[in-house]
Curated annotation (Swiss-Prot):
GO terms for biological process: centrosome cycle; imaginal disc pattern formation; maintenance of neuroblast polarity; metaphase/anaphase transition of mitotic cell cycle; mitotic cell cycle; negative regulation of neuroblast proliferation; positive regulation of canonical Wnt signaling pathway; positive regulation of smoothened signaling pathway. WD repeats lie at residues 79-118, 144-185, 228-266, 277-317, 336-374, 391-432, 467-498. Residues 1-30 are annotated as: Disordered. Residues 11-28 have a biased composition (Pro residues). InterPro entries: PP2A_PR55, PP2A_PR55_CS, WD40/YVTN_repeat-like_dom_sf, WD40_repeat_dom_sf, WD40_rpt. This is Protein phosphatase PP2A 55 kDa regulatory subunit. Keywords: Repeat, WD repeat. SUPFAM superfamilies: WD40 repeat-like. One of its GO terms (molecular function) is protein phosphatase regulator activity. It comes from Drosophila melanogaster (Fruit fly). Could perform a substrate recognition function or could be responsible for targeting the enzyme complex to the appropriate subcellular compartment.
Amino acid sequence: MGRWGRQSPVLEPPDPQMQTTPPPPTLPPRTFMRQSSITKIGNMLNTAININGAKKPASNGEASWCFSQIKGALDDDVTDADIISCVEFNHDGELLATGDKGGRVVIFQRDPASKAANPRRGEYNVYSTFQSHEPEFDYLKSLEIEEKINKIRWLQQKNPVHFLLSTNDKTVKLWKVSERDKSFGGYNTKEENGLIRDPQNVTALRVPSVKQIPLLVEASPRRTFANAHTYHINSISVNSDQETFLSADDLRINLWHLEVVNQSYNIVDIKPTNMEELTEVITAAEFHPTECNVFVYSSSKGTIRLCDMRSAALCDRHSKQFEEPENPTNRSFFSEIISSISDVKLSNSGRYMISRDYLSIKVWDLHMETKPIETYPVHEYLRAKLCSLYENDCIFDKFECCWNGKDSSIMTGSYNNFFRVFDRNSKKDVTLEASRDIIKPKTVLKPRKVCTGGKRKKDEISVDCLDFNKKILHTAWHPEENIIAVAATNNLFIFQDKF
């Protein structure tokens, strides 16, 4: 098996070639099952980068963000299928993909005119829309399988064609996105509309010709990776070798080859023999950006494990474990829930990683396991409201986080459509709002402040007035420029640094 690990038992197989094992019992406590994660991290910058790449000081010594675009209907009546469930830039930032709860994938392409403008603007137009997943029904377990897109990951582009992976709770699909501006015509046996010609009407031999047609973007499924997960898939990650990828559910992580759909290899399995002994679940997993044998995964107990596939076929024993000891004075009924890591992302350099729990985001050095090197509170003012957040289930929300291209800033989301941006160099942070009130082009975002006391200033909002139904769970940062995409319910906001 080599570094592939042991072969994973393929579950619920429709294909007789697939290996099968009896489905495990249902997972206990909701505390674990609802803590798989997604969170987003906010960043604050102390210098503004202009579009040409030169640094210019902002008026207050900090970078200013301005509105660029909003995508999606502006109606207050939002259907559940239109809610955005993931956002992802491709490796050069020219394409931006979103997935929603209706199983659709929408790809936006950078507007060439906005990129060529001086200063450059971050504007995107719809490039392609397709239905990635359909709702299914598991007759063996009498369970509905939602069509919701949990994750999207791009493969690096090697030719004019783009490839991406998308997944719902059970099935990962590889999609090919290509352009076509030519078609063939003048066939002897077919008409232009595709109908077969009557042989009696064929009186002359025609040479097929190539015709120019309006640009057509086609998305076609190339591979379907299914029947390998008993529990819901929470993460997919493409390896740096661009040949393999991992998929993680609550208890297992499987390794796939992009050319092989009928088998995967189980590289992590934390399922106990007795399910009553279950103490944690996997919440997120990701490959190292440059080392193809290294990956990390986080758990609901607040730990992050780094594994090396060269050490063993089954990575049940980690190479490193990152965990911050809990302060006994902060121990409470909710400690275990809020310490669950909802998202983990390795930096572009591969030296650091960030993790998001319910109240904070932490930066870890891969060379230091004992504690994070930086900790940024996201919405510490909610600590006093954990009881009510538990009752309305908000405490189980899955916030994602992301790096900027230079690993100098991080971003994540919060409630009331707020998102946070943290500058690692200046240690400054800012709270911004994705609001329809600021959808005029070039509108500069004003920093927002949350007040916890009785008196508040004019530009502050009381913590009691926060809308917990409005939340920023998914964000993405352009890999090369200061352009960010923020998903707010059914709308996608695009912001960039001030012109």
